[in-house]
């Protein structure tokens, strides 16, 4: 269903943008405050930082999920949903505690953004399902950690050092992907020279044509077996270079800084 694929692509992008936004504002901390010391998220509050923040969940990104319960549970998904709701709805100033799904919110203040980005009504498909811990952990790893490089292993990406245009490049990169449902079993292939580069472009080939490709062009999983996506699987692929040809592909930094400054000023000013 092409329409369902488009909707799921749109919702998946919104989900990723939520995470990117929170990575950025939490990492920037005090830099995101207005003249009253108010920010999008209260990173100075231990209660928020240790109990609700994305930064705390990020600390679990490399924890081995050794049991079936750990892999197939929904702790990370439920924690993110709670965080998204908190950012959207806020926690009123002057309230010391607020009941939340059988628990309580600690004493900190956060003003709801009421932004469409965090509105669950904009992501009805994702709202209707739960994501397993192993899936959410992989998403956090891909957004949090650099690629493995020699003896160094994977390092943590610092969102605090990202410039506005760099963050915009990530945004544009995500828009270069589109989603679709496999109409038949599809094999992943990649140019042999690019096989060690996980960011190189990947192609999907039906079983009937896989014989046209060499063994060193077949993408393999961790067990060394060819990667095959069953019929009905939802897949992301690069949508081509169309956006690079459009005016939306690049925005001068002076303009992005101006837009960011006054957008945040207007939003934070609503709290006063």
Question: Model-derived features: where do they sit?
Answer:
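Preference for the N-terminal adenyl/adenosyl cofactor-binding alpha/beta module
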Residues: 1-272
